[in-house]
């Protein structure tokens, strides 16, 4: 499975315009062959974070063409070109079955961290973070990849409250593994304001 993460910055006062564009124009036009799921949140003022899951790189390339067409329409809304990172998901698991439908309201945490060695970072997440996921209540899905020296991990929850129960456990593990990271991990958190699952997502899917 392949993931694309898009971080965009809206101009001051234009965040609602960006949200409306994504809801009403972008998502309907971004469906391409191989698309599994898409979602957007607003984790910080004027920051828009999108996550897209696809079957493979070929699907991601098709999505990239559609994405660029949409970005071209946003010159008066975005503060600059979005940051786009994409790659093969190396760790991932679905904890709840989800049907193909439009989705809003999920709470998502996406953590970015510069790392010196991708394999060491992956082993840490596999051995220390995924056991926390496996015991968590209200977790919908989680995954991990490294793109150009930056580790990206994500988890989707029923609610912010469910996520907050386990965040201290994440932080405890992260604080004991500072040597893995070139700089402190940065977490983006927010509620999905626009999203869609294009297929039924099965529990246990990896």
Spans of features found by a protein language model:
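Short S/T/G/P-rich N-terminal loop/turn motif that feeds into the first structured element of a domain
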Residues: 1-49, 53-72, 76-206
């Amino acid at each position: 499975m392949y993931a694309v993460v898009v971080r965009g910055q809206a101009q001051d006062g234009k965040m609602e315009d960006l949200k409306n564009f994504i809801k009403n124009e972008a998502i309907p036009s971004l469906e391409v062959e191989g698309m599994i799921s898409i979602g957007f949140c607003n984790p910080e003022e004027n920051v828009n974070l999108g996550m897209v899951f696809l079957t493979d790189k070929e699907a991601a390339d098709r999505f990239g063409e559609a994405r660029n067409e949409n970005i071209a329409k946003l010159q008066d809304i975005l503060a600059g070109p979005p940051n786009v990172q994409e790659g093969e998901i190396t760790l991932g698991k679905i904890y709840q079955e989800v049907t193909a439908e439009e989705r809003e309201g999920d709470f998502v945490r996406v953590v970015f961290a510069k790392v010196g060695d991708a394999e060491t970072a992956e082993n840490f997440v596999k051995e220390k973070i995924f056991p926390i996921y496996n015991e968590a209540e209200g977790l919908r899905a989680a995954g991990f990849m490294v793109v150009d020296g930056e580790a990206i991990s994500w988890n989707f929850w029923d609610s912010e409250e469910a996520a907050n129960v386990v965040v201290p456990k994440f932080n405890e593990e992260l604080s004991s593994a500072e040597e893995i990271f070139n700089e402190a991990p940065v977490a983006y958190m927010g509620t999905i304001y626009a999203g869609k699952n294009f297929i039924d997502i099965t529990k246990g899917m990896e």
